[in-house]
From Swiss-Prot:
Cofactor note: Binds 2 Fe(2+) ions per subunit.
GO biological process, any: fatty acid biosynthetic process
Membrane spanning residue stretches: none
Cofactors named for this entry: Fe(2+)
Gene Ontology cellular-component annotations: chloroplast stroma
Homology family: Belongs to the fatty acid desaturase type 2 family.
UniProt name for this protein: Acyl-[acyl-carrier-protein] desaturase 6, chloroplastic
GO MF entries: metal ion binding; stearoyl-[ACP] desaturase activity
Length: 422
């Protein structure tokens, strides 16, 4: 139920009011969610001199109170005491996080995974490209669309690096800071940069994609940016990034299995996706360690940050993705990923479950406030709730007997794919 409607309900009951079903109310975004706002004509009151506008005013007061409370909590994460926790962690980052970066000389490069004329020579390069195109021809369009979504996500790296540099106490303020935090961000970004490069290069060589349209999608996504909520809080930023690193590792790993020897036989693409997935797992380990350390140092604030991020749902950073035509493209991409098996609701649930176990959330007790205990319990119970929601959604879909629709995707020369939208 919409937040404002929930807040207004107890007061409405006391005044013997009921919703006016003949009236509609606009919706807007509140605290990161779509919320139905109550207009003065939304409620009909009997046996009371109180008007609908009074109820609307009371609901607005409740919303304002919630907003003030939430703003105050977010400000607490930027207090000197909280930021000092991150500052004090720097020697630990030097010892336990920076070693997860590989030396440049030992790191793979895109040319290691795809045909390289410097190694193969002219004729060998052309022969290798012909073989790559032959294998790529067997990959179905559904997986190609999911591959574009994965690649566009990786190519929006400038957005992610700038977001991390805005995080208090850890950002690279000069662009060349010598702190352990700043060196981690730059090193992580340098390794991530290869992911979009190698996927882009494969797609170009395969001949299966309209690269101009794909490149425009990347351009649009970087231009649109990414609103981080809450902004600048290191606690929330690291929870989000830990989740995202595992999610991308899962998506690339699933893609590798689906297109590989046991799937559609594209060994080159399977190798590319598998290599990227391994990188993402290593990066996930870094961010997971950071959150674990925060939970040790400040368990109450840490677990409340985890709960806040999960309550809102951890959306993929490609949510503003656009092909310049469809307003619902992201919903289509999410549904296609579910159909293809590259990233599913079950994957999301498994990620939550894994992180809850990795961070030993269930064991948190000492130092927790009442709110902290409620946050802990919410996080621990969430995987089961997600599974129940998935089951109910499936039951509703079966009852509704919805049929998939066929839509053209300009990334693959407007070939049609079937998608089942919610």
């Amino acid at each position: 139920m919409a937040a404002t409607a929930t807040m207004a309900m107890p007061l409405a009951n006391r005044l013997r009011c009921k919703p006016n079903t003949n009236s509609s109310s606009p919706s807007r975004t509140l605290f990161g969610r779509r919320v139905t706002m109550i207009s003065s004509s939304r409620w009909m009151c009997r046996g009371s001199a109180v008007s609908g506008s009074a109820i609307m005013s009371a609901a607005a007061d409740d919303v304002a109170a919630v907003r003030r409370e939430e703003d105050e909590e977010m400000r607490s994460y930027l207090s000197p005491e909280k930021l000092e926790v991150l500052t004090q962690m720097e020697p630990w980052v030097e010892e336990h996080v920076l070693p997860l970066l590989k030396p440049v000389e030992a790191a793979w490069q895109p040319s290691d995974l795809l045909p390289d004329p410097a190694v193969l020579g002219g004729e060998g390069f052309h022969a290798a490209c012909a073989e790559l195109r032959e294998r790529a021809a067997g990959v179905p369009d559904l997986l190609l669309v999911c591959l574009v979504a994965n690649m566009v996500t990786e190519e929006a790296l400038p957005t992610y690096q700038s977001s991390l540099n805005r995080v208090r106490a850890v950002g690279d303020l000069t662009g060349a800071d010598a702190t352990a935090w700043a060196r981690w961000i730059r090193g992580w970004s340098a390794e991530e940069n290869r992911h979009g490069d190698v996927l882009n290069r494969y797609m170009y060589l395969s001949g299966r994609f309209d690269m101009a349209e794909v490149e425009r999608a990347v351009h649009r996504l970087i231009r649109s940016g990414m609103a981080v909520d809450p902004p600048c809080s290191p606690y929330h930023a690291f929870v989000y990034t830990a989740f995202q690193e595992r999610a991308t590792a899962v998506a690339h790993g699933n893609t590798a299995r689906l297109v590989g020897a046991r799937g559609h036989g594209d060994a080159a693409l399977a190798r590319v996706c598998g290599t990227v997935a391994a990188d993402e797992k290593r990066h996930e380990a870094a961010y997971t360690r950071i959150v674990s350390r925060l939970l040790e140092a400040d368990p109450d604030a840490g677990v409340r940050a985890v709960a806040r991020m999960l309550r809102r749902g951890v959306a993929m950073p490609t949510s503003p993705i656009s092909d310049g035509r469809r307003d619902d493209l992201y919903a289509c991409v999410v549904s296609l990923a579910e159909q293809a098996g590259t990233y599913t609701v079950s994957d999301y649930c498994s990620i939550v479950e894994h992180l809850v176990w990795e961070w030993r959330v269930e064991e948190l007790a000492a130092g927790l406030s009442g709110e902290g205990r409620r946050a802990r319990d919410y996080v621990c119970e969430l995987p089961q709730k997600i599974r129940r929601m998935k089951e109910k959604a499936h039951e509703r879909a079966v009852k509704a007997q919805k049929k998939p629709i066929s839509i053209p995707i300009n990334w693959i020369f407007d070939r049609h794919v079937s998608v089942m939208l919610p």
